[in-house]
């Protein structure tokens, strides 16, 4: 719960990939079944020649050369049957005849001694695969924890290079060199690149229309289906007050609602509107930051009440909430405020339209994990969602000087189709309160300044 980087990393990589014309799906806090369904939806966006990119930040491990992403509901200790195998996802992407497959894995690669299975995933020789591991084999990945807005170590340097018009392996080589000069993690974390890329492929390559133009159009519509925001609306009350509701997307499964009074009678001395059906301690705050909206705060209109709804993938019915208006008039004296209410239905916003909460539907992702000698088996009954990963015992690390307060990094992802998975720490349906998830707005781009700050007071947090 105390970790901050994954949500920030996913948000910033999402914006960078969009600048490169990627269709990005960015998701936080997914259970196993939600992750499998999200992968299936991601695969629907792929076809011949498409560049597919998946970024993941969070709990993970590596056994026998296979990497495993850990969902938020994985038991402790977890096994491969509770996780998603990255190589299994790659095999499914290969079946789509993608032009480039890029995996950026921002997670630890330590062995999981609770998992003794030996995967046997046979991949095709496609000469278009690039892996960028945030750390070396059998090592940990870190985020730098401080009082300021912060990235994980990998993304801190990746975001400065991602838009470079260079072959993707050249970009990652330069990121590795930058990370190697960062004193805070030197000797503890080093980027590892694995590639079978035989052509010059860059994330900046222009999008071209080929034989699959019609198919690409269909896939773009499929992506748009899960990223349409509710239209802003005006609510008029009998007392003469008019309220405007606006909506913004922080991630594919996080919605921001802002409420603003645009008109009221001249003799109304007090007027306030807020959303019911949500926890008032978490919602209807007067600044975005109070409600946990740190990343969008600068682009939202001012002088509103703000509400943040996360984990939209769990929404089973249409989203209906009540707007309550309170007001007093000059003629009322000391009488209590009058209340008016209106019900609002915004159907299923953003990723909620895809019903990722259902049991695994298309068996593509699951079947790949069920190959002979595969580490996975049928997941059985769906686990109840836990809000946070359970951290293992880190007592063995606490003896390291200057690197205390060690905790695991939560799950995050971006993906061109680009897909970021993110394991932030906000609970289902409600935003985190400022005390539990405090992320400032701006990030420093000055590496030297960051080094000085972190060398003086550094907390390394492995994933």
Which ranges hold each PLM region?
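Cysteine endopeptidase catalytic domains of the caspase/legumain-like
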Residues: 1-463
């Amino acid at each position: 719960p105390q970790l901050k980087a994954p949500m920030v990393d996913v948000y910033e990589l999402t914006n960078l990939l969009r600048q490169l014309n990627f269709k990005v799906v960015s998701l936080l806090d997914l259970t196993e079944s939600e992750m499998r369904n999200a992968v299936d939806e991601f695969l629907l966006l792929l076809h011949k020649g498409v560049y597919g990119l998946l970024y993941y930040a969070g709990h993970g491990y590596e056994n026998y050369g296979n990497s495993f992403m850990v969902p938020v509901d994985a038991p402790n200790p977890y096994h491969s049957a509770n996780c998603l195998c990255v190589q299994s996802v790659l095999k499914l992407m290969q079946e789509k005849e993608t032009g480039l497959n890029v995996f950026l894995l921002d997670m630890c690669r330590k062995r999981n001694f609770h998992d003794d299975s030996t995967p046997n995933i046979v991949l095709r020789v496609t000469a278009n695969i690039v892996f960028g591991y945030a750390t070396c084999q059998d090592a940990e990945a870190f985020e730098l924890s401080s009082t300021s807005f912060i990235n994980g170590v990998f993304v801190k340097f990746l975001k400065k290079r991602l838009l470079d018009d260079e072959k993707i392996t050249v970009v990652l080589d330069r990121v590795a060199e930058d990370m190697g000069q960062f004193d805070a993690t030197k000797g503890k974390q080093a980027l590892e690149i694995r590639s079978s890329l035989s052509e010059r492929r860059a994330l900046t390559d222009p999008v071209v229309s080929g034989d699959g133009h019609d198919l690409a159009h269909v896939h773009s519509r499929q992506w748009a289906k899960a990223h349409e925001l509710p239209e802003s609306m005006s609510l008029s009350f009998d007392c003469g007050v008019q309220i405007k509701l606006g909506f913004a997307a922080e991630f594919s499964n996080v919605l921001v609602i802002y409420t603003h009074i645009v008109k009221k009678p001249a003799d109304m001395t007090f007027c306030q509107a807020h959303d019911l059906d949500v926890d008032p301690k978490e919602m209807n705050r007067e600044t975005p930051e109070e409600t946990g909206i740190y990343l969008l705060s600068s682009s939202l209109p001012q002088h509103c009440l703000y509400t943040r709804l996360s984990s939209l993938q769990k929404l089973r019915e249409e989203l209906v909430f009540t707007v309550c208006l309170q007001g007093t008039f000059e003629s009322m004296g000391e009488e209590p405020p009058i209340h008016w209410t209106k019900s609002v239905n915004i159907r299923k916003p953003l990723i909620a339209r895809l019903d990722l909460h259902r049991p695994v539907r298309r068996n593509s992702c699951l079947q790949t994990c069920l190959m002979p000698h595969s580490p996975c088996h049928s997941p059985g009954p769906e686990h109840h969602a836990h809000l946070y990963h359970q951290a293992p015992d880190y007592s063995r690390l606490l003896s390291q000087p200057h690197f205390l307060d060690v905790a695991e990094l939560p799950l995050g992802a971006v993906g061109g189709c680009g897909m970021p998975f993110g394991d932030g720490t906000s609970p289902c349906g409600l935003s985190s309160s400022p005390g539990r998830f405090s992320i400032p707005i701006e990030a420093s781009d000055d590496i030297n300044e960051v080094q000085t700050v972190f060398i003086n007071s550094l907390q390394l947090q492995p994933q």
